[in-house]
Amino acid sequence: MTDTPQNPTADLPIKVTARNVTVSYSGKQALHDVSIDIPDRSVTAFIGPSGCGKSTFLRCLNRMNDTIDGAVVGGSLTIDGQEINDKTIDPVVLRASVGMVFQKPNPFPKSIYDNVAYGPRIHGLALTRPELDEIVENALRKAGLWNEVSDRLNHPGTGLSGGQQQRLVIARAIAVNPEVILMDEPCSALDPIATARIEELIDELRENYCIIIVTHSMQQAARVSQHTAFFHMGNLVEYGPTEDIFTNPRDTRTQDYITGRFG
């Protein structure tokens, strides 16, 4: 239980603030009083065994739990000081500013161009075709994909390799100017070479975005993140600079997890 916030990031601007966040599904509590401050322009990793609550908390950040029957979310959750669970907040607009990248690449059954252009079209971010072209190119460049696909933008996104598809999905998220990018096991379906490219991309993107990644790979958390939060049985057990979590954990449960005593 973390009813006082864990904040090892006092020297960094805070992007996401959670206070006593709870989640239950059909009356069964899945997350217990999570309080945390997550900094901007950095990568924060959520680690822990299966069913520990890390993905449940991640889904709170763009209100994906709203889509689950029987889900009840409590507590306060703000992005840049704005309470995202306020009933006046349109979840569709929220999900544009809080992008989501899932475990399995999920490009739309559209062309590469239309995959990236989809969000800007819906949200009216481009008034002309040249403006839309620029948004698409910029997003693909930021995702490290432009040089690989610039000559075949009309080809299906589903025809790309797994790693390219995942970068296309990241470009799709970037195209609508998000504040936060959520990644739920983004490399679990990829081979080691594609995983390394995604990890390089994450490191590049953190210069401009708040990135939060759920991963079962402690090695990946150590490689890509600046801060790490360890969840266990629906509780946020420990949160701190990644190096401290892995080399000098304060809680014995964290120590036991990272040394492989359970998982």
UniProtKB/Swiss-Prot annotation:
Residues 16-258 form the ABC transporter domain. It is found in: Cell inner membrane. GO terms for biological process: phosphate ion transmembrane transport. SMART domains: AAA (SM00382). It is an enzyme of class 7 (translocase). It holds the Pfam family ABC_tran. It is a peripheral membrane protein. It comes from the Bacteria. Its main location: membrane. ATP binds at residues 48-55. It catalyses: phosphate(out) + ATP + H2O = ADP + 2 phosphate(in) + H(+). GO terms for cellular component: plasma membrane. Gene3D superfamilies: P-loop containing nucleotide triphosphate hydrolases. GO terms for molecular function: ATP binding; ATP hydrolysis activity; ATPase-coupled phosphate ion transmembrane transporter activity. Its EC number is 7.3.2.1. Keywords: ATP-binding, Cell inner membrane, Cell membrane, Membrane, Nucleotide-binding, Phosphate transport, Translocase, Transport. Disulfide bonds: none annotated. The complex is composed of two ATP-binding proteins (PstB), two transmembrane proteins (PstC and PstA) and a solute-binding protein (PstS). NCBIfam families: 3a0107s01c2 (TIGR00972). Belongs to the ABC transporter superfamily. Phosphate importer (TC 3.A.1.7) family. Part of the ABC transporter complex PstSACB involved in phosphate import. Responsible for energy coupling to the transport system. This is Phosphate import ATP-binding protein PstB. The lineage of its organism: Bacteria, Pseudomonadati, Pseudomonadota, Alphaproteobacteria, Maricaulales.
